[in-house]
Every structure is written in structure tokens, then in C-alpha cells.
Amino acid sequence: MNFDIARKRMVETQIISRGVKDRRLIEAMLKVPRHVFVEEAMAAQAYSDTPLPIGEKQTISQPYMVALMTELLELSGREKVLEIGTGSGYQAAILATLADRVYTVERIRPLALKARRALDRLGLLNVNIKISDGTIGWEEEAPFDAIIVTAGAPDVPDKLAEQLAVGGRLVIPVGNQFDQVLVRITKQEDGSLIRENVTGCRFVKLVGKYGWGTEE
């Protein structure tokens, strides 16, 4: 299979055709090899218009959803970004090509280690991974110019909102354990939060102290 052709087709038919306009983001998705972040047996499906299982009851998000959430962050290249839910590492790889520094938190050790290997393979040295409860964030590195959460939460965790810089944007799926709304939060100078509902979505649930408490 020619992955370069598959990746180009993915961007043209799934990303650009659905209204994603950020040129830097489009270039990043043309550049980052998504198949590196899935199991070898599923590499041929890596550029399909669907989420894929990556083990540990987790998934790699649909390419369009990765693009949409990233575009909502409005990255210019100078930002420090926090990602909650490293998963396969693909979203972190996209962020790493668009921002200055990426801090990503994954609670499942095998996924974090596998993601680290994939990111290292691509030479993405501006990504820092922490194995921890993502709903707590990464307080010692706060504040962040942008925060992206790749799992569905019952509400926006206060801990994450607190770690968002003034003028920063937080993108997160919010709802029940089966269906959510993609939400963008922008922090104002007075510390207040402006909330925008973007679109319906469906993510695995955000497990942790300030999310869904358990996997059950």
C-alpha cells in the first residue's frame, strides 16, 4: 500500500472537503504518517474515515475529528499545549508540528510507552509525556496556551480550566458516556470562561478524579 497516496487522499476527501481551512494544519496532516500510530495489522486502515482500536479499550480518533479539534485551538506555532489522553500519540504528533511545546498526559502506561516510541521514531522531541490521571492536568507546567481533551467528560474539569492561560482555548467533548458535544472554552482577561458548542461527537469516556470516576 502506498501510504503517501492514502494520506493525501485522506486530507483531500476527509479534511479539506469538510471545511478545514488552516493551511498549517493541512500541511501537518499531509506530513505526519498516521499508520505509524496504529498496530501493523491495521496499517492499511489508518487513513480510513473512522476511529480505530489501539488496545486497552481505547481508540485513535477519526482523522476529521483530529483536524477539527486542532483547528479550534487556533495554533500559531508559539504555544505551549496540554493534551489529555495521549492514546496512540497521533494527535500529539500533529500538535508537535504546529506548536512550540506539547505536554501530554496518559493514564494507561502501555499506551504512553507505545506513543513515546512512535513519536521518537518521527523525531518529535518537543513532546513530553506523563503517565498520570489526565483530569488533574499538569499543574507544574501550567499555564497552557491551549488544552485539548481526547475523551468525553461529564463537564469541563475545573482543574483544566484553572491551568488555561488568559486568552487560551480548551477543546473538550462534554456529555454522557455515549454521546457528547464538542465544546470550546476561551478564558477571558477577568478569568471568566466563554463556552461555544461546536458539534455532536462520540468519544471514549474521560476516566479520572475529575471525569468519570471509573472505567465501569
From Swiss-Prot:
GO terms for molecular function: protein-L-isoaspartate (D-aspartate) O-methyltransferase activity. It comes from the Bacteria. The active site is at S61. SUPFAM superfamilies: S-adenosyl-L-methionine-dependent methyltransferases. This is Protein-L-isoaspartate O-methyltransferase. Its EC number is 2.1.1.77. InterPro entries: PCMT, SAM-dependent_MTases_sf. It is found in: Cytoplasm. It catalyses: [protein]-L-isoaspartate + S-adenosyl-L-methionine = [protein]-L-isoaspartate alpha-methyl ester + S-adenosyl-L-homocysteine. GO terms for biological process: methylation; protein modification process; protein repair. Catalyzes the methyl esterification of L-isoaspartyl residues in peptides and proteins that result from spontaneous decomposition of normal L-aspartyl and L-asparaginyl residues. It plays a role in the repair and/or degradation of damaged proteins. The gene is pcm. Keywords: Cytoplasm, Methyltransferase, S-adenosyl-L-methionine, Transferase. One of its GO terms (cellular component) is cytoplasm. PANTHER family: PROTEIN-L-ISOASPARTATE O-METHYLTRANSFERASE (PTHR11579), PROTEIN-L-ISOASPARTATE(D-ASPARTATE) O-METHYLTRANSFERASE (PTHR11579:SF0). Belongs to the methyltransferase superfamily. L-isoaspartyl/D-aspartyl protein methyltransferase family. Its main location: cytoplasm.
